[in-house]
């Protein structure tokens, strides 16, 4: 049984300069891949990590990075969106990173948003994370109200992957990605819990500016 104490180290990059922050985050991720080529990276979506992914792709194109043995697990995925939907996190990750580097498709893991059985989807994702040996480095972008993934502040610390109802604020904020139509915005997501995140051997939190 993995303990939920923070086994490794927690690093936080807080920087108003987005390019600087992205480079620092990419440095830490690339160091992990170089140190342990078959590492397990926990990845996140959103505006904060995009710059870091672009930097990693740049280094990959220069021949400095090799993702052929890397395994990835993503923090979260919308419930009910097909993988290929342009707003799914599966699409986001492929567009910003996976399609541009030599990662093996079978080494890419996200919660299965298409699984209608929430308990089953979460159980399977927890099993995947355990079966790959846990997370070596978990990247987190801190949201504006202090939420990590879709874990809102005050979320129970003992939770692993679980299904969450998105807050009205989150749904409203996401409207712009769905032609302004609130009916099309997913109302739930599958997300790694705080317990899962804290079991990562290293956690890298990236905070851009004040948000």
Each language-model region and where it sits:
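Single conserved hydrophobic/aromatic residue that forms the stacking wall/gate
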Residues: 1-8, 13
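Ligand-binding beta-strand-loop-alpha-helix segment within the catalytic cores
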Residues: 9, 65-138
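Glycine-rich N-terminal segment of FAD-binding domains in flavoprotein oxidoreductases
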Residues: 35-61
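A glycine-rich beta-strand to alpha-helix segment
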Residues: 39, 47-52, 127-155
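Short beta-strand segments
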Residues: 42-46, 74, 111-112, 139-142, ...
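A glycine- and small-aliphatic-rich helix-loop capping segment at beta-alpha/alpha-beta transitions
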Residues: 55-66, 89-91, 153-163
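Class I SAM-dependent methyltransferase SAM-binding "motif I" and its flanking Rossmann-like core
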Residues: 149-194
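C-terminal functional extensions of proteins
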Residues: 190-211
């Amino acid at each position: 049984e993995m303990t939920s104490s923070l086994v490794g180290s927690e690093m936080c990059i807080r920087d108003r300069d987005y390019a600087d922050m992205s480079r620092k985050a990419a440095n830490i991720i690339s160091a992990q891949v170089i140190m342990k080529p078959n590492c397990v990276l926990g990845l996140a979506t959103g505006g904060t990590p995009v710059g870091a992914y672009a930097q990693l792709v740049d280094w990959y194109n220069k021949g400095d990075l090799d993702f052929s043995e890397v395994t990835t697990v993503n923090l979260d995925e919308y419930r009910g969106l097909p993988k290929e939907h342009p707003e799914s996190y599966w699409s986001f990750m492929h567009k910003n990173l996976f399609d541009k580097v030599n990662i093996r498709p079978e080494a890419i893991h996200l919660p299965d948003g298409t699984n209608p059985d929430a308990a089953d989807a979460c159980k399977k994702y927890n099993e995947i994370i355990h079966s790959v040996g846990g997370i070596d480095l978990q990247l987190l972008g801190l949201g504006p109200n202090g939420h990590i993934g879709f874990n809102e502040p005050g979320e129970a610390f003992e939770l692993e992957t679980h299904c969450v109802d998105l807050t009205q604020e989150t749904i409203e904020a996401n409207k712009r990605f769905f032609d302004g139509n609130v009916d099309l915005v997913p109302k739930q997501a599958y997300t790694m819990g705080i317990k899962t995140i804290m079991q990562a051997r290293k956690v890298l939190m990236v905070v851009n500016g004040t948000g």
